[in-house]
Amino acid sequence: MKREQLYSGKAKTIYRTDDPDTLIAEFRNSLTAFNGEKKGEMELKGYYNAQISKKIFEMLEASGVKTHFVSMLTDIDMLVREVEIIKIEVIVRNIAAGSITRKYPIKEGTILKPPVLVFDFKSDEYGDPMLNDDIALALGIATREELAELRKLALRVNELLVPYLDEKGILLPDFKLEFGRREGEIVLADEISCDTCRFWDKKTGQSMDKDVFRFDKGDISKAYEEVARRIVPEIFE
């Protein structure tokens, strides 16, 4: 299969294929934090994230959520449908952690009911600033109807993901989603992994995600491996 590099992001490299309708997303071992200011490498990181994303995409698809996922070509190469990415990061917060506790008088660990949903402008140049509907409309990055659909889809993903992870002893304080347009519909894109979610151990509250790297909380490799063991135990058999 043809592999023509389209672009390389912080953690994945995207390639064109012989099929104009599909792309290859290669999950790399790169680690970044603070908008790329902190960088590192972790052996098997791309493998764990790819396999976690695959399993979660399959679960969501089985529950009626459309995604860009097609299949795995290798352990780290995901075949995906090409979509027109909407330049909005949709963040869903179930438990207060991270920036919300620094910007607002909300203590870490506070249960957020209903979940807090936030839009950020997907732009490294501008530091991913928070959006409201009016700014998104002014930027021309989505219609009012699309913004409503993004909210609906993100909350549906949350409804499915929280109990799915809870059964595996994982709490989901918050996570980031990206969506794209395809054939007149909005579908889930990017990845759902230790890079895009906060995962806490249900018993201990310990971080099992990129915060371990971001804030030097311990062994990042063990954290990602533990999440993979709980979500995709079959890859360790």
UniProtKB/Swiss-Prot annotation:
Pathway: Purine metabolism; IMP biosynthesis via de novo pathway; 5-amino-1-(5-phospho-D-ribosyl)imidazole-4-carboxamide from 5-amino-1-(5-phospho-D-ribosyl)imidazole-4-carboxylate: step 1/2. CDD domains: SAICAR_synt_PurC. Keywords: ATP-binding, Ligase, Nucleotide-binding, Purine biosynthesis. It catalyses: 5-amino-1-(5-phospho-D-ribosyl)imidazole-4-carboxylate + L-aspartate + ATP = (2S)-2-[5-amino-1-(5-phospho-beta-D-ribosyl)imidazole-4-carboxamido]succinate + ADP + phosphate + 2 H(+). Its EC number is 6.3.2.6. InterPro entries: SAICAR_synt/ADE2_N, SAICAR_synt_PurC, SAICAR_synth, SAICAR_synthetase, SAICAR_synthetase_CS. It is an enzyme of class 6 (ligase). This is Phosphoribosylaminoimidazole-succinocarboxamide synthase.
